[in-house]
Regions:
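Canonical Rossmann dinucleotide-binding motif of NAD(H)/NADP(H)-dependent dehydrogenases/reductases
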Residues: 2-42
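The beta1-alpha1 cofactor-binding region of Rossmann-like NAD(H)/NADP(H)-dependent oxidoreductases
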Residues: 45-46, 68-82, 137, 148-151
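Hydrophobic/aromatic anchor residues within beta-strands of the central parallel beta-sheet
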Residues: 64-66, 255
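Catalytic loop of short-chain dehydrogenase/reductase
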Residues: 100, 106-144, 163-248, 259, ...
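C-terminal helical subdomain
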Residues: 153, 237, 257-265, 269-307
């Protein structure tokens, strides 16, 4: 992709998942404007290639390339890793942005409720939306396989290339306000996920299996799981936990997670209140952290916050 070995070493390269629209596309645009070569990925090849063409054309940004990626498909993830290895020889920035809501929604019914943003953010909308948002078992499986296992799949495949970064690797996991432990009704689950010294992927994945079993048996509320966007909320809570495990395991990298803000995007059925440009600021800041920047932290937009 580039001429000399020296050029390769100096060039910063980023991979962004789920980047054909919304926050992901805006993160790609902003990083490219900072001189980073961006590998924009998307599950849909036509939409992803179209997003790259729009950046190159109307935005006059040449340093963006497309590669197809389905975070739920091992072979697709492997193909991306091989592409980055052969084209760039290393990776400096990984932004795990691909996500799924895990919910079946009656969009018109949701619109008719006219729920204000404050009700969404505070959790007061939980009881209002139960009739229009439906959590299915299959939806939860897809949600976990995308938001947690998909992130893990991509990260593990790209870690060898991130370890070769000459500028210091950055991993940014795009999370959600719904991830915050204070929103988890179960005290025992909160305590388990707060015990950072003993937190492991095995424990995290055990929690996901428990959730699925409780969902199947119809006892989510009784066992203390969140009832607002249940699988989505839990997937982002464990994504934060995985971020802390990664940061501890790879001290030479800066690994953080971030709630981008209540952005108006497809994943929240366009109920958000801030623009994608605003929402991308936190992830971009973390992707470009200086060498002495924080790691193993959670950010609410650009401000460090409590898990």
């Amino acid at each position: 992709m580039v001429g000399s070995n020296e050029q390769r070493e100096m060039q910063r390269v980023a991979v962004i998942t789920g980047a054909n629209k919304g926050i992901g596309l805006e993160i790609a645009r902003q990083l490219a404007l900072h001189g980073v070569t961006v590998v924009l990925t998307a599950r849909d090849e036509k939409r992803g290639a179209g997003a790259v063409e729009s950046l190159r054309g109307s935005h006059q940004i040449p340093n963006v390339v497309f590669h197809q990626l389905d975070v739920r498909d091992e072979s697709s993830v492997g193909a991306l890793a091989e592409f980055v290895r052969t084209q760039f020889g290393k990776l400096d920035i990984l932004v795990n942005n691909a996500g799924a809501s895990g919910i079946s929604v009656d969009v018109e019914g949701l619109k008719s409720l006219g729920i204000d943003p404050e009700a969404w953010l505070s959790g007061k909308a939980t009881s209002l939306v139960q009739g229009v948002l439906r959590q299915t078992y299959d939806g939860a499986v897809t949600c976990f396989d995308t938001n947690y296992y998909g992130c893990k799949r991509v990260t593990e495949a790209l870690l060898p290339l991130l370890e070769l970064s000459t500028s210091g690797a950055r991993i940014v996991n795009v999370s959600s306000l719904r991830s915050e432990l204070r929103r988890m009704p179960s005290e025992s689950i909160r305590e388990e996920l707060s015990d950072i010294d003993n937190l492991t992927e095995e424990k995290i994945e055990g929690l996901l299996r428990r959730f699925l079993e409780d969902l199947k048996e119809g006892r989510l509320e009784a066992t203390g799981w969140p009832m607002m966007l249940p699988s989505y909320s839990v997937s982002k809570t464990v994504l934060n936990a995985y971020t802390r495990v990664l940061a501890r395991r790879h001290p030479s990298m800066l690994v953080n997670c971030v709630h981008p803000g209540y952005v108006k995007t497809d994943i929240n059925w366009n109920t958000g209140v801030i623009t994608t440009e605003e929402g991308a600021k936190g992830p971009v800041m973390l992707a470009l952290l200086p060498a002495d920047g924080p790691t193993g932290c959670y950010f609410d937009q650009t401000t460090k916050a409590e898990f």
